[in-house]
Amino acid sequence: MTIASERTPVLELRNITLHYGSVEALHDVSIKSYAGEVIGLVGDNGAGKSSLIKVISGVNTADSGEVIVDGVRRHWRSPHDSMAAGIETLYQDSGLAPDLSIGSNIFLGREKRRSGLLGRLGFVDQRAMEKEALEQLARVGITIPATQRTVSELSGGQRQAVAIGRAIAWAKHVIVLDEPTNHLGARQSAEVLNVIKSAREQGLSVIFISHSLPHVLEVTDRIIVLRLGRVVRDAPTSEFTVESLLGTITGLNESTGS
Amino acid sequence: MSTSVDALVTTVKSQSRVRRVVTNQQFVLFVVLIALILFFASRNSLFFRVGEFSNLFTDFSGLVLIALAETYVIVAGGIDLAVGSTAAVSGVVAAGWIQPLVNHGVNQAVILLVGTLACAVVGALAGGLSALLITAFDLVPFVATLVTYSVGAGLALVISHGAPVGYNPGAIYWSASGIGMITWLVAIVLVVAVVLGVVLHLTVYGRYNFAIGSNEFAARAAGIAVRRHLISVYVLAGVLAGLTGMFFYIRSGSGAATTGVTNSANLVAIAAVVIGGASLTGGVGRWAGTMLGAAVLTVVSDGLIFINVPPTWIQVVVGALIAVAALLQSFRRRSRRVP
């Protein structure tokens, strides 16, 4: 056992099993993540990565198993519950509402209301949201010229910047990033990796899902490999190379033993 | 934090101000509306009489609530084909329920309030049926509301036996009273319309409506109770259709199964929304657009009659209007897209 195990994990999943109809997406999956640590979650298509993060974020509910945050057993009835517990998730390609402004997207589900009676009637304070959205993005190192612009008017890189900025700005404990470097150029990807490193410095627990193995090896402290819904390897990143990681993902170096 | 993500950010070319105004659907519609009024007035000077404007407001009021109902539904990414027959069935049911009160000479204000409540309840039930089929049985909105449309139209015929239900001359009398060209009935409808606009654009409820229509998954992942919201939207649409049923009851003094059905009010309402610049894929639409769309359709329908165009041609003109509006929207979307 490593030193890390003496600390309380900020997020722990115990024996998670999830079915979609008769298909078993996750089988007895247990993982722990700690503050100030970046975990790489890798696996082939259909290995269960997206299913696992949907269990973490409350989009899906596991058939059995436990979700434990800061030592407390939790049950998510909806994504709202996990967000309230300080867990933010960046979904692959689909986390933003393209027809809403950048500011509205940053505050989606957390709209600021006007003060007094109007606020109680549900009136939103759009001006304050646009202003604070700029500040929040700037705080995590992202500058966007005008937040009133709708997301549909942004380039792919800009959308990703807004999505990452939103997740990091709100995350208190855990941030889950599903393929954040997808569709990005080399330079933009490097910047995203820098944002991940600074999230770790802030003391967040980061769960990073990617098909880009060099990115995973560069930025993570520990790598969890999923195959066909099971955890097949959970080890410090230093124990992997691109080749051995690829072998573990595909299962090709199973017979040789690793 | 020290990291900079400037590399992720490339400046978006902003389009010229002139182009932005010209491609603004509401602005174009406003110009079209004024032009239409001037055109009809130039062809027939009687068009400018107070009486004709009063008629325009009244016809507009019969359309605007279901058009706004349709705006909420379409912005949320759905469609509601049921609003026309919901108006019919609620008018017929309410007319039957309140006729005993009319016969007993109960105060007209009480009768109309009870009738309004009854229409709202029947409308809510119709909207609830659509919502149930969509959220619990996963039917697509088009099919689910087609079911509600058929059930509503059928029940309206069954209940009314194809004849007007009830007779309330007091309601007709009241429907004509008001100040100048605005009757009390129209004034009430306009107040409801304004409230709907405020809720759509200034409140959290309206914001969720846009978010769900724009990207349902993003809305769900952001913690929005999507299912509950969609149920409320279809029920709201049903209530507004019910109120429209009551509107026509008050104007004619009876409930009729033909209300909103024979004139395909559901399609006219959708046309108003589309002309107003909303996107049928959801997430895009404006209250002002629908108001102007409904106004343009009202002025065209009434104005063509005024200059002796056969009513049969009106639908052709409406079709052309929808085509122009849709083309304008597609042009605007292309001009805004970032390469």
What are these language model-derived features?
Chain B
Residues 34, 38-43, 48-102, 132-142, ...:
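Single transmembrane alpha-helix segments in multi-pass membrane proteins
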Residues 32-48, 156-161, 197-204:
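Structural signal for alpha-helical transmembrane segments and their membrane-water exit/capping regions
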Residues 2-67, 102-115, 232:
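Membrane-interfacial amphipathic/re-entrant helices at transmembrane-helix boundaries
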Residues 111-119, 125-130, 181-256:
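Helix-loop-helix "hairpin" substructures at the membrane interface of multi-pass membrane proteins
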Residues 1-38, 221-228, 300-339:
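Cytosolic-side transmembrane-helix boundaries in multi-pass membrane proteins
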Residues 256-319:
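Transmembrane alpha-helical segments in multi-pass inner-membrane proteins
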Residues 137, 141-203, 229-232, 251-264, ...:
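Transmembrane helix-bundle core of multi-pass membrane transporters
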Residues 102-149, 292-293:
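Alpha-helical transmembrane segments within multi-pass membrane transporters and channels
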